[in-house]
Regions:
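Early extracytoplasmic/lumenal segment of secretory-pathway proteins
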Residues: 26-99
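Extracytoplasmic ligand-binding site segments that recognize negatively charged/polar headgroups
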Residues: 34-44, 68-72, 92, 98-236, ...
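A ligand-binding cleft/hinge motif common to bilobed small-molecule-binding domains
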Residues: 102-104, 257-273
Length: 382
């Protein structure tokens, strides 16, 4: 009896030494993200501490699957395997994925339609929240951010920048070798320029963005690119996304398509003259979002709360805009008053929220996208 009493006393002593609340294991919210390492760092270093403070006992753990569509494909394969295995709970609560991955996962019933269950869902109206390269993802995703392609230009040289692709076509003839882009192999800023050109000159804007795909439209795409071959005689071909910015910095060209977030990052690092500007021309140029999604067998309540925080105007302003120079995932007008005046002017002085709403376009759906690249190689590059 004395031995049992001694054991009981020892157990009480051990329990007394354990901090209250740690007897029960923490709940882990698993965030799996495609993209570069900065995506993982953003979740672990910025979002996680805020969410954990709001939810004592919850631990956010982010892991990355790598950049590009390949990163999203790995998340798809992971969810698909767990679905086929009949797992009661999956080990991904929040997925951060590209458009192509989202389209596949919605089609295969791997994601929950959660957007209308979170208050921030009503703060998003851009078509990219509903349409992922022609696939209907309405309700299943919320954009984390939007990256956008636009024209960067030197206002000392380009006094009156073109407002449309038609005006640009006229401008390069009057200002030969002052415009540069990287074709379709050196980076997506050049690809975005080419798809923007086809949108402007083919009359196929809705079809390119939403489908359905019609292979009979290939001659229309090829015809729209005929003018681009002549256009290229008056321009400089740059070596890539960074190459276009570098040539702008050195004054070798005065205008060219760039990723806006790269543009502002280069400017902040002193790699571009501070007077450089950006412009989004009619009828528009493409950009692309990253999406927050909730898998079918996730910890749904916590996942929705996490995404609601991540897409709130306050976090979008501080985390997405100020830290990364990305455009917000929610409509930009909802950030007014959340950003200091300097940050607002920096990001929206040249391209307004209305410009993003009307001229920020998605890339064409996959089969048209491939047709454009193939036609460019045949009709323009050769």
């Amino acid at each position: 009896m004395k031995r049992l009493q001694g054991l009981g006393a020892s157990m009480l002593l051990v329990l007394a030494m354990v901090p209250f609340g740690s007897v029960q294991a923490d709940t882990t919210l698993n965030v799996v993200t495609a993209g570069d390492q900065n995506m993982v760092d953003y979740v672990n270093n910025y979002l996680a501490p805020r969410f954990e403070k709001m939810n004592p006992g919850v631990k956010v753990r982010a892991v990355g699957t790598g950049p590009g569509d390949a990163g999203s494909q790995k998340i798809y394969e992971k969810l698909s395997a767990q679905s086929k295995a009949g797992a009661a709970a999956w080990d991904v609560d929040v997925a951060v994925i590209h458009q192509r991955g989202a389209a596949t996962m919605v089609k295969e019933n791997l994601l929950l339609p959660y957007r209308n269950d979170v208050s921030v869902g009503k703060l998003v109206s851009r078509d990219t929240a509903k349409n992922a390269l022609g696939a209907n993802v309405d309700g299943y995703v919320l954009p984390m951010f939007h990256s956008q392609i636009a024209f960067a230009y030197n206002p000392d040289v380009v006094k009156t920048p073109p407002k449309s692709f038609t005006e640009l076509n006229e401008w390069v003839r009057k200002n030969p070798k002052q415009f540069g882009y990287n074709g379709v192999k050196g980076g997506m800023s050049g690809v975005g320029f080419v798809t923007g050109w086809v949108t402007a000159y083919s009359g196929m804007a809705d079809k390119l963005e939403k489908g359905p795909y019609d292979p009979a439209m290939k001659p229309v795409i090829e015809k729209s690119l005929a003018g681009l071959k002549e256009f290229n005689q008056y321009v400089v071909m740059t070596p890539g996304n960074a190459g276009t910015l570098d040539m702008l910095n050195r004054g070798e060209i005065a205008m060219g398509p760039v990723w806006v977030d790269m543009f502002y990052t280069w400017m902040a690092d002193g790699k571009l003259p501070p007077n450089m500007r950006v412009k989004l021309v009619a009828p528009g140029m493409p950009g692309q979002p990253m999406y927050y999604a909730v898998p079918v067998k996730a910890n749904t309540k916590l996942a929705e709360e996490f995404i609601a925080l991540a897409t709130s105007p306050e976090v979008q302003a501080e985390g997405i805009v100020k830290r990364f120079n990305w455009y917000p995932g929610i409509d930009a007008k909802n950030l007014e008053g959340k950003l200091d005046e300097a940050a607002w002017k920096k990001l929206f002085a040249d391209i307004s929220p209305d410009d993003l709403q009307t001229k920020g376009k998605p890339f064409p759906i996959a089969p048209y996208f491939n047709d454009i690249l193939e036609a460019y190689e045949r009709k323009v590059a050769n």
